[in-house]
Curated annotation (Swiss-Prot):
It comes from the Archaea. [4Fe-4S] cluster binds at C304, C364, C367. GO terms for molecular function: 3-isopropylmalate dehydratase activity; 4 iron, 4 sulfur cluster binding; homoaconitate hydratase activity; metal ion binding. This is Probable methanogen homoaconitase large subunit. Heterotetramer of 2 HacA and 2 HacB proteins. Pathway: Organic acid metabolism; 2-oxosuberate biosynthesis.
């Protein structure tokens, strides 16, 4: 019998096969499909086109489709408002009740938080960072509107079974070193195309001990090295998180001991210092001391990568009772309403407001340069987001540095890229 890794086992089950091998083309059952306000309308148009050619006029299962408004919330243009209107009407017509509007949160936070994500699932999303759900032991990947329209119609999609890459992470980071630094370091070594169309499996004692927030950060950025998906075997914290949010059954898959990997990589992060991805590539990574003193105009704390409660708490502790630098716009956007409320209750939002930060509703706006913090020509941002290519957060002549929440918070205070000086416990 062929030895299989986690991804292969999940895909084999979804395809109704005993085993699959890399390079094999399969048709797989989809457990959950997600679109957001930017990708729902093109998916809907293609779905209707399929229906006009004799395809299904109704979605395969309205309970397995989730729609989230997060990219332009509240709508910042007439076009965005129209996209959202079209999506609302389609959801109403098709009986899709799982539609989250009015700044409920970023899709990749809302889905796990609301109990839609479980180990062993096949999840597809019309967004490249759908790979985030691999943190829960699911096979999750992004796709375009055409493929998603076929999923809406049939509940199935095709995959080429990916080659696998195993990344073992060991060691206990110290100080202000977190999951963001770990994944930036990995991408810096492997490169933005070093894992193209590969299933990246994260293992090792660092991953095993990492909390849910950190694990989501790692898997979220797997696509930034070209991966088809990132995946981890769920640890106890992850299983507790899932069970607290859903009573539905699930199956946890583990890789066979002798399963094959195209590549194996090992990273010891014991002595890692905070990392910064410099313009204009995510793999242009250096230790923070190499770029300290770089002027910034904006600091952004949020996104599906680092907008969780743990991230906000780290930043608030770094800020304390200090004030944001007078020349810096410090923008904070919690990843969901649930996170926002908890941060309010615990005084974290008050810390940001008293420091002079701009606290926005949950959403993706600043990350993709859509609204709530667009950069002008020549401006520089340091952000907890996942991409920094030219023009990502605004004008093509602007620049973006990526860093962890502590570095972003300290930089907002100092007005230049800075490493936190305060003592911190063990990272990750």
């Amino acid at each position: 019998m062929v030895k299989m890794n986690m991804t292969e086992k999940i895909l084999a089950e979804a395809a109704g096969l005993r085993e699959v091998t890399p390079g094999e083309i399969i048709e797989a059952r989809v457990d959950l499909a997600m679109t957001h306000d930017g990708t729902s309308p093109p998916t809907i148009r293609t779905f209707r086109d399929i229906a006009s050619r004799g395809g299904p006029a109704r979605v395969w299962d309205p309970e397995r489709i989730v729609m989230v408004f997060d990219h332009n919330v509240p709508a910042n243009t007439i076009g965005a408002a129209e996209f959202q209107r079209v999506t609302r009407e389609f959801a109403r017509e098709q009986g899709i009740v799982n539609i989250f509007q009015n700044a409920a949160g970023i899709c990749h936070q809302v889905l796990p938080e609301r109990g839609f994500v479980r180990p062993g699932m096949v999840i597809v999303g019309a967004d490249s960072h759908t790979c985030t759900y691999g943190a829960f032991g699911a096979f999750a990947t992004g796709m375009g509107a055409t493929d998603m329209a076929m999923v809406f119609a049939t509940g199935k999609t095709w995959f080429m079974v990916p080659e696998a890459m195993r990344i073992e992470v060991t060691g206990e980071p110290e100080g202000h070193v977190y999951a963001k630094d770990v994944i930036l370091h990995i991408i810096g070594e492997i490169g933005v195309d070093g894992a193209t169309y590969r299933s990246v499996e994260f293992t090792g004692d660092t991953i095993e001990s990492m909390d849910v927030s950190g694990r989501m950060t790692i898997c979220n950025m797997a696509v930034e090295m070209g991966a088809k998906n990132g995946i981890m075997e769920p640890n106890r914290q992850t299983l507790d998180y899932v069970r607290a949010r859903t009573g539905r059954e699930f199956r946890v898959y583990s890789s066979d001991e002798d399963s094959q990997y195209l590549e194996d990589h090992h990273f010891d992060v014991s002595d890692l210092e905070p990392q910064v991805a410099c313009p204009d590539d995510v793999d242009n990574v250096y230790p923070v001391h190499r770029v300290e003193g770089t002027h910034i105009d904006e600091a952004f704390l949020g996104s599906c990568t680092n907008g969780r409660y743990e991230d906000l708490k780290i930043a608030a502790e770094v800020i304390g009772d200090r004030r944001v630098h007078e020349d810096v716009r410090f923008i904070v956007s919690p990843a969901s309403r649930e996170i926002y409320l908890k941060a309010l209750e615990d005084g974290i939002i008050e810390t940001f407001i008293r420091a002079g930060a701009i606290v926005c509703n949950p959403g993706c706006g600043p990350c993709l340069g859509a609204h709530m913090g667009v950069l002008a020509p020549g401006e520089v941002s340091i952000a907890t987001t996942n991409r920094n290519f030219r023009g990502r957060m605004g004008d093509p002549a602007s620049s973006v540095y990526l860093a962890n929440p502590a570095v972003v918070a300290e930089s907002a205070i100092e007005g230049v890229i800075s490493a936190p000086q305060q003592e911190a416990g063990n990272g990750c």
